[in-house]
Amino acid sequence: MAIAATISMCLINQKGGCGKSSTCFHLAGALAATGHRLLLVDADPQGSISQAFFGSDAVERFTPWETLAGLFDDECDSISSGTLIRSTHIEGIHVLPANQFLATYNAPSPERAGVMQFALRDFLEPLTAFDVVLIDCPPNLYQCSWNAMLPGASH
């Protein structure tokens, strides 16, 4: 079942342990079971969504350029969706993973913050392979959360 335009939603709350990652994980499963194509964006440096799909050991071995952190790194200006987005064992669900490297970019210096604020929106905008984009946010309102709110506001 295809949706006319991609729907982007971020699950955000300034409190940890309130179920953002669990809700994102289970909502993705339910939507995939009904035939929707999902992209889960793990915007939390804890990488809970990434660990749920790929395991802790694998997630710890990802380089910054294999995770959401690559969008914020000046050295990765030509990074592609094929490099960042990973398929999972569940049909219809793909993940843009995160790990500890994302913490470096969650609270950038003031001169970098302006350049970084549209990175995720600009990355997601041309993607047409997904019906729904779910973004799991960290328990704060720093850079990763602001980035997560922009794609939903533009749809």
Predicted regions and their residues:
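P-loop NTP-binding core
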Residues: 1-155
